[in-house]
Regions:
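Divalent metal-coordination and catalytic microenvironments
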Residues: 1, 30, 102
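Divalent-metal-activated hydrolytic enzyme cores
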Residues: 5-11, 18-23, 37-109
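Short strand-loop junctions, especially beta-strand C-caps/beta-turns
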Residues: 3-4, 33
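Ordered, amphipathic secondary-structure segments that act as subunit-interaction surfaces
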Residues: 24-33
Length: 109
C-alpha cells in the first residue's frame, strides 16, 4: 500500500487487519522514501502551493506532513506492532528507501 507520506492512518490499519486475516499477510514493511514532498515542508506550504498553482483551497484537508521521517517511521511501526486487532505473529519492520542511491536502510524500531 502506498499513501502520501507513508503514514499509518486509520484506513491503513483497517486494510492491514483485512490483509492479515483474509489474505494471510505475515509481514508488513513500512518504508518511506527520501525526497518525499510530505517531508519537505510545512502543511501550510503545501496548501499555499496548491492554491497558487491550481486555484484550489485545500485547507479543509489535513495532509499530515512529516518533519522527521525517521521518528515518524518508528512511531508508525510501533503503532502497527501494538494494534490489538492485527493477527498474532505478524512481523512489522521499518526501512527508508533512498531514491537517489536505491539503497534501503532498515531502521531499528
Amino acid at each position: 500500500m502506498r499513501n502520501a507520506g507513508a503514514l499509518v492512518t486509520e484506513d491503513v490499519l483497517r486494510t492491514l487487519v483485512l490483509a492479515t486475516y483474509l489474505l494471510g499477510v505475515k509481514r508488513i514493511l513500512i518504508m518511506p522514501h527520501t525526497n518525499c514532498r510530505m517531508a519537505m515542508g510545512e502543511e501550510a506550504d503545501i496548501h499555499a502551493l496548491i492554491q497558487k498553482e491550481h486555484g484550489v483551497d485545500t485547507r479543509s484537508l489535513e495532509f499530515r506532513t512529516v518533519s522527521d521521517q525517521r521518528a515518524a517511521l518508528i512511531t508508525d511501526v510501533n503503532r502497527v506492532r501494538s494494534y490489538p486487532l492485527l493477527n498474532d505473529g505478524v512481523v512489522v519492520g521499518g526501512a527508508i528507501y533512498d531514491v537517489t542511491s536505491g539503497k534501503i536502510t532498515t531502521v531499528d524500531c
